[in-house]
């Protein structure tokens, strides 16, 4: 095992313009796995023409859309904490400047599963309808066993995946801790997204000794061989929360939502919270974190 610790700027250099970017999430909760530290750095570096794959496209995807980083989004849900469609995503889609691929929760999960298992697709029964041709990569086929028509759900294979965890060692072995107990994304979708991706950027609240990882293997959800970069990023999920570390910052979420309603105000938001802080430590100091 090699030491994979690096800076957020070096880690994000793994992402190229035009790549497919997988973001492990779900929505705002104390169990969020969203690497907002990496999302902000992607916007800061001005990455362009990205396809973002995110189970629930929310603030993190909206920030990248508003920063001009995206050409397309793929999701099973797209909403802003019960307040409708995220403002930048809505505005850009209405203007024809952002495309979308929509899944059901089940088809998205199967796509991530196929990618994590190294398969090209997974068959799905019961989804064959007149909407299938509208998805650019789905196909129907006849079962070789009984001739039944099935849907081939294409594997989701990000070029780069982002994930934030409570703790990890320097090699990339990562633990979700209490997150595993109540979060389907931590238990299944996030690890599969990591396995599916060609490269993985992992940010973490703290870096712990490998001996501690070995002592609590039941809490380890990601293994070193799937991770390419490890970045220490306290408050790295903010304004989302992390179980046992901090709660979601709902005031900041509302501040973001108000700023994103207007392009000029959103540019000011980016200047303050994305372009000005040089890395996770500076961002944590800006928001008053430890």
Please provide the spans of the model-predicted regions.
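Conserved alpha/beta enzyme-core scaffold
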Residues: 1-290
């Amino acid at each position: 095992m090699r030491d994979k610790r690096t800076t957020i700027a070096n880690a994000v250099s793994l992402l190229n313009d035009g790549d497919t970017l997988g973001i492990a999430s779900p929505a705002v909760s104390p169990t969020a796995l969203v690497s907002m530290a990496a999302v902000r750095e992607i916007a800061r570096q001005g990455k362009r023409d990205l396809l973002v794959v995110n189970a629930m496209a929310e603030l993190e995807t909206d920030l990248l859309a508003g920063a001009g980083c995206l050409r397309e989004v793929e999701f099973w849900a797209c909403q802003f904490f019960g307040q409708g469609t995220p403002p930048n995503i809505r505005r850009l889609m209405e203007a024809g400047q952002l495309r979308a691929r929509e899944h059901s929760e089940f088809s998205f999960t199967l796509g991530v599963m196929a990618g994590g298992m190294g398969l090209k697709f997974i068959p799905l029964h019961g989804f064959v309808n007149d909407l299938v041709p509208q998805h650019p990569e789905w196909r129907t086929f006849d079962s070789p066993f009984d001739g039944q028509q099935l849907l081939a759900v294409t594997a989701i294979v990000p070029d780069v995946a982002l994930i934030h965890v409570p703790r990890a060692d320097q090699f990339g072995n990562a633990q979700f801790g209490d997150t595993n107990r109540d979060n389907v994304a931590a238990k299944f979708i996030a690890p599969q997204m990591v396995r599916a991706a060609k490269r993985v950027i992992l940010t973490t609240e703290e870096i712990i000794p490998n001996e501690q990882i070995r002592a609590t293997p039941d809490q380890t959800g990601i293994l070193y061989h799937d991770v390419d970069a490890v970045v220490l990023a306290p408050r790295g999920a903010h304004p989302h929360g992390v179980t046992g570390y901090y709660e979601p910052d709902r005031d900041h979420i509302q501040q973001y939502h108000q700023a994103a309603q207007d392009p000029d105000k959103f540019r000011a938001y980016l200047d303050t919270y994305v372009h000005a802080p040089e890395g996770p430590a500076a961002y944590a100091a800006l928001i008053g974190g430890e």
